[in-house]
């Protein structure tokens, strides 16, 4: 599989997605202020609402001609539907994130069917002692922005 990302605003050709089938709102990890706000105010969405929203989103992507690469489900991998955090691409290099929370680290195992299609010399695993999530990375051609949060070192 050929990969290449030089910016965040060019036409999206393919994207990794993961089903929200395993989402359990009763077992929601309160790990940031946004989630805490919604949990404290009764605004945590139902599983059905999330699945419906995801279906609509996937339908829009397909109508736009985006190829969906669907990750396999991994038991115990909370937040697996947040695929942006698990890995990222800069140029032609595929980086496997190093997640701080162990249950989040499990989720990348669902990507094996996708990772196995990438040239192994293009894959870089972020070391375990550096916490870096793909959602903290923004690529803008020769400039790469890295956000820093409580879960990033």
Stretches found by the model and what they are:
Residues 1-153:
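The feature marks the mature, well-folded catalytic cores of soluble enzymes
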């Amino acid at each position: 599989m050929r990969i290449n990302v030089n910016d965040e605003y060019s036409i999206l050709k393919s994207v990794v997605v993961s089903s929200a089938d395993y989402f359990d709102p009763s077992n929601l990890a309160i790990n940031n202020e946004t989630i805490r706000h919604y949990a404290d105010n009764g605004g945590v969405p139902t599983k059905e609402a999330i699945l419906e929203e995801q279906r609509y989103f996937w339908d829009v992507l397909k109508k736009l001609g985006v190829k969906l690469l669907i990750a396999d489900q991994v038991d115990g991998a909370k937040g697996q539907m947040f695929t942006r955090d698990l890995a990222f691409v800069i140029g032609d290099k595929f980086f496997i994130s190093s997640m701080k929370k162990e249950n989040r680290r499990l989720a990348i195992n669902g990507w094996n069917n996708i990772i196995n299609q990438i040239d192994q010399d293009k894959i870089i695993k972020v070391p375990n002692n550096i916490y870096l999530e793909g959602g903290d990375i923004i690529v803008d051609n020769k400039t790469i922005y890295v956000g820093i949060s409580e879960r990033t070192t």
